[in-house]
Amino acid sequence: MKLGFIGTGKITSSVITGICNSSIKYNRIFVSSRNNKISKNLKKRFKKISIEKNNQKIIDSCSWIFLAVTPTVGKKILKDLKFRSNQTVISFISTITIPQLKKMIKVKSDIL
């Protein structure tokens, strides 16, 4: 299983640390390079981390997508990203509801 994180802040860092220190099976974790300091630190700490500059490449590569950006950034970037129906999308975006997110990503994915 490949996991992808759009947004690289405290939430992403905490979730990835939890995943990497657990018994969850995964092949690779892709993180956006939005916050270089945090993404480089994660890559240094955990060997299965890859940093990606292009959010669409993260979505194209992963079956689980974690959205951890601010609401303003989410509204700006999500409309241009192309998700697949077989992906699971997990959103940490505080003010974007699941029905709103479904309209933005335009695909019948599982959204949590």
Segments from the language model and where they lie:
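NAD(P)+-binding Rossmann beta1-loop-alpha1 motif at the extreme N-terminus of oxidoreductases
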Residues: 1-53
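Rossmann-like NAD(P)(H) cofactor-binding subdomain of soluble oxidoreductases
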Residues: 36-38, 46-49, 55-60, 64-112
